[in-house]
């Protein structure tokens, strides 16, 4: 009887069939579909930080419907204490938040993970071109003006991740 382990490369959507000795009927086949496991691992991970819980909920639901794995925070200081290095593919960060603005938060997060991509979310009255000139921080890829439709949000997120 084999009691060791084996390694096999299984990709998204693969079915895997394994034959093993069972009791008492002898040989049995077991099919496992790894789609769900692999989709979780392969989906892009987005962190949304906005002090407005309604905004994080709407963004989260819209992005999840499009296959993204989404984590949300309403407190920028909590993000700093919970941030996981090399985990997130993209951060969506509101600029105007109490306790710490999104620009300062983004700088600190880039110190923790210099490879993460960041998009700022800003209210309609903000001048995005001025912000882009004032904060040419490495890793800041885009500015998204609120209000934004879910379709536009998803399009911008996908463009940033491609």
Spell out what each predicted region is:
Residues 1-45, 149-162:
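Non-catalytic signal-transmission and effector/linker regions of two-component phosphorelay proteins
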Residues 53-71, 138, 160:
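Two-component/phosphorelay signaling modules centered on CheY-like receiver
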Residues 72-90:
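Acidic, metal-coordinating helix/loop segments flanking the phosphotransfer/catalytic sites
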Residues 74-75, 101-105:
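Acidic catalytic/metal-coordinating carboxylates
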Residues 94:
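Active-site residues of response regulator receiver
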Residues 97:
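Receiver (REC) domain active-site loop signature in two-component systems and cognate sites
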Residues 104, 125-144, 151-155:
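Alpha4 helix (beta4-alpha4-beta5 surface) of REC/receiver domains from two-component response regulators
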Residues 121-123:
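Hydrophobic/aromatic residues positioned on beta-strands within the core alpha/beta folds
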